A protein has these predicted regions:
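A cross-family signal for N-terminal binding/gating loops and helix N-caps
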Residues: 1-203
């Protein structure tokens, strides 16, 4: 079996490159549990689709602006780094586009660089050299790690658009996208309907 067997034709314009406004007007596909039928609805219809006493579990992870452009020293060749996970002691797990060997120094900003520690098929780690914690530097200078299928460059507006209403605990490199469609008005209507809400942190 080839992966290409799962390809199918579709109009790329159907991929939403920007969020629906208002957010809760996004389309929602509903599976009816009794007869297994499908219904096309909208997210703002959730209060009447759920029952009093139901519980919504939402992810309160916050997306870190973890994508940066860098230059290899001394060649100046450009590379892109996505900082995936802080492993402690200034060591980060990363994804790097481009060829890099252990020991390679990548400049990513004034007085900020990453030295490749391990470069493997499934894992790459770097040691960050920075006068301030990298997470703090990324908040100021990093770009939001938009999904590649959006095929557009991130904007300053994405720092707001690509966070959910529940975002509290920084650490994600991708938004829990279902949560992007909730608004304060929708939450108020769910609460009035007697629908509970609890949070988990997954990133």
């Amino acid at each position: 079996m080839q992966l290409s067997e799962f390809d199918f034709p579709f109009d790329p314009l159907l991929i939403a490159a920007h969020p629906c406004l208002p957010r809760d007007h996004a389309r929602l596909l509903v599976l009816q549990p009794l007869n297994r039928s499908l219904a096309h609805r909208r997210v703002d219809e959730l209060p009447k689709l759920l029952q009093p006493g139901d519980l919504l579990v939402v992810n309160n992870t916050k997306v870190l602006a973890a994508r940066v452009a860098g230059r290899k020293r001394p060649s100046g060749a450009e590379v892109e780094i996505l900082f995936v996970k802080d492993l402690g002691d200034a060591i980060w797990e990363v994804l790097i586009k481009g060829t890099c060997r252990p020991g390679q120094i990548i400049e990513i900003g004034a007085e900020v660089s990453a030295v490749v520690v391990e470069r493997g098929a499934t894992r790459t780690t770097v040691r960050v050299e920075s006068p301030i914690p990298l997470s703090e530097w990324l908040r100021q200078h990093g770009r939001m790690p938009l999904p590649p299928y959006l095929k557009r460059a991130p904007t300053d507006q994405d720092r707001e658009w690509y966070q959910t209403l529940f975002a509290q605990h920084e650490g994600a490199i991708a938004a829990p996208t279902a949560g992007l469609h909730f608004t304060p008005e929708l939450l108020a209507r769910l609460q009035q309907r007697g629908i509970g809400l609890t949070t988990v942190t997954l990133h």
